[in-house]
């Protein structure tokens, strides 16, 4: 008798999780470029879409953090590790791993050095090129915040400067070991935003 009751409770708990998941996903349906939505208790904005999915920026900082204590190279940075573990996990718990799309990041420096190459992220920071592309949709914020674009690279004897966005929206370079705001970008599956009529 006890075993059957436990099985029934487990089945009901599973069904409840599935219903919650489905309802959680529906809250994003029908959104389009320029719209905002809430995810991990933060406001996000849809900046664009392509064949891979929907490119979104977190409009609220996750707090102030250093990029890294020693180097401006994104692939080895502490901030990338934080976004790829803690924040990725939180996002996936809310919308499912199938809705968070990996995407290539171009680590070209502000002065045109390609030494750092590219990498693939699921949760990342905006690059300077992306910031320029979507600038008309990104309002000024009251604080400084990180981009993943280095000012230069090790081959120029510069492994500590990285680009940041000022409260006025201008681009500056700062030491990678100073704390600034963290506004991640992600590509989410376009199916998450499709209305039931699509």
Where are these regions (language model features)?
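Collagenous Gly-X-Y triple-helix signature in extracellular proteins
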Residues: 10, 18-198
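Acidic, low-complexity intrinsically disordered segments
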Residues: 1-10
